[in-house]
Amino acid sequence: MNIRPLADRVLIKPAAAEEKTLGGIIIPDSAKEKPLKGEIVAVGNGTKDEEMVVKVGDNVLYGKYAGTEIELDGEKYLIMRQADVLAII
């Protein structure tokens, strides 16, 4: 993958959605919740007012409506501003 986010943006690979409930019921694709965590795979350079706190490899939590979904090499990613990242886990 050859993509580099600009300014204060980060590229995140979302965690896989749950396939089954704790009781063993298989969840159909139409009912799966969007995961709210993922791994940082690329980081921009930041801005003159804001340094980048997150780094490649960090696992993070983000808001439900944060970011823009993109597809690269057949895989789904989210690109969002660092401010949309809620926490590093």
Swiss-Prot record:
MF annotations from Gene Ontology: ATP binding; metal ion binding; protein folding chaperone; protein-folding chaperone binding; unfolded protein binding
GO terms for biological process, alphabetical: chaperone cofactor-dependent protein refolding
Record Pfam families: Cpn10 (PF00166)
Keywords: Chaperone, Cytoplasm
Entry keyword Chaperone: yes
InterPro entries: Chaperonin_GroES (IPR020818), Chaperonin_GroES_sf (IPR037124), Chaprnonin_Cpn10_CS (IPR018369), GroES-like_sf (IPR011032)
Signal sequence segment: none
Cytoplasm listed as a keyword: yes
GO cellular component: cytoplasm
Protein purpose: Together with the chaperonin GroEL, plays an essential role in assisting protein folding. The GroEL-GroES system forms a nano-cage that allows encapsulation of the non-native substrate proteins and provides a physical environment optimized to promote and accelerate protein folding. GroES binds to the apical surface of the GroEL ring, thereby capping the opening of the GroEL channel.
Similarity-based family: Belongs to the GroES chaperonin family.
PANTHER family, alphabetized: 10 KDA HEAT SHOCK PROTEIN, CO-CHAPERONIN GROES
Protein name: Co-chaperonin GroES
Organism: Parabacteroides distasonis (strain ATCC 8503 / DSM 20701 / CIP 104284 / JCM 5825 / NCTC 11152)
Gene: groES
